[in-house]
Amino acid sequence: MNFATKIVILLLVAALILAVTSEKGDSSSDDNEAKETEGELPLSDFYGSCVRPKKCKPHLKCNAAQICVFPKTGR
């Protein structure tokens, strides 16, 4: 084997290793995306939904998505 062939094989092995490790990272990034989505509406978990029998706390109102939000900001 000449030097160029060794370099090509080394690059292929490195690409294979990167592909395998990035696939493992993708599954954990899905979990992170789910956590980020949960973090977008922090009041919904804390105050709950507006669906009966649960009601919003007095200083909040129910929006169209049935989530308790601040009346002025809608968040």
From Swiss-Prot:
Residues 1-19 form the signal peptide. Disulfide bonds join 50-62, 56-68. Expressed by the venom gland. GO terms for molecular function: toxin activity. Coiled coil: none annotated. It is found in: Secreted. Keywords: Disulfide bond, Secreted, Signal, Toxin. The keyword Kinase does not apply. GO terms for cellular component: extracellular region. Its main location: secreted. Insecticidal toxin. This is Insecticidal toxin OcyC10. The lineage of its organism: Eukaryota, Metazoa, Ecdysozoa, Arthropoda, Chelicerata.
